[in-house]
C-alpha cells in the first residue's frame, strides 16, 4: 500500500495568493468557471500567465510521483476550487465507487491525486483519510499526494467559517488519457 505524502512549503505564499485571486476573478461568474456540488471550480488551461505557474506545480508533482512511487505519470485534470461555509465532501475514492466497486466510474484512469492548499484563514475543511484515521489541517503551500484508489478513501470536513481554496489535481499512468499532449 502506498503512503500519503505531505510536503509543507511546496509553493510560496505569493503563489498561493496568485492562485486564489485568479480563482476569485474567474469562478462560476463567467465562462471559465463552473459549479460542482456547490463549489466554484475554475479551470485555467487557456490563461498563459497562470498556466505557467500551474505547469510548474504539476511538473513538480509529476517528479514527486517518479521519486516517491517509482511511477511515470501524466496530468489527467486539474482545477482551482472554492469551498464556502457549509461545504464538505463525503468520503470517496477518485477512480471507483466505494459503495459499488463493480459500477464503471467516470474517472477510472486517475492513478494519483494531489491537493494543494492555498490558504488557512478558515475553520474546518480538513482532508481526512478514513482508512488511516488520519486528517490533514490545510496550510498554505502544503501539498498532499496519494494514490487515487480504494487504499486512500478520503473526504473533506465541513467548512465552518471562512473560505477554503485548493488546487485539486489528478494524474494518470496512461499517456492516452493525459490532459496535455
Regions found by a protein language model. Name each.
Residues 1-143, 151-181:
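Fe(II)/2-oxoglutarate oxygenase catalytic core
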Amino acid at each position: 500500500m502506498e503512503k500519503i505524502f505531505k510536503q509543507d512549503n511546496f509553493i510560496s505564499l505569493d503563489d498561493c495568493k496568485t492562485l486564489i485571486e485568479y480563482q476569485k476573478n474567474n469562478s462560476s461568474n463567467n465562462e471559465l468557471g463552473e459549479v460542482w456540488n456547490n463549489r466554484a471550480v475554475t479551470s485555467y488551461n487557456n490563461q498563459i500567465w497562470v498556466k505557467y505557474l500551474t505547469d510548474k506545480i504539476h511538473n513538480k508533482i509529476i517528479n514527486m510521483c517518479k521519486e516517491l512511487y517509482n511511477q511515470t505519470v501524466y496530468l489527467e485534470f486539474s482545477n482551482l476550487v472554492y469551498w464556502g461555509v457549509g461545504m464538505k465532501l463525503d468520503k470517496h475514492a477518485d477512480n471507483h465507487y466505494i459503495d459499488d466497486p463493480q459500477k464503471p466510474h467516470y474517472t477510472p484512469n486517475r492513478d494519483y491525486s494531489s491537493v494543494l492548499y492555498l490558504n488557512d484563514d478558515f475553520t474546518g475543511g480538513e482532508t481526512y483519510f478514513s482508512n488511516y484515521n488520519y486528517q490533514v489541517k490545510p496550510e498554505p503551500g502544503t501539498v498532499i499526494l496519494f494514490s487515487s484508489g480504494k487504499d486512500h478513501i478520503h473526504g473533506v470536513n465541513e467548512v465552518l467559517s471562512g473560505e477554503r481554496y485548493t488546487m485539486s489535481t489528478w494524474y494518470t499512468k496512461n499517456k492516452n488519457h493525459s490532459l496535455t499532449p
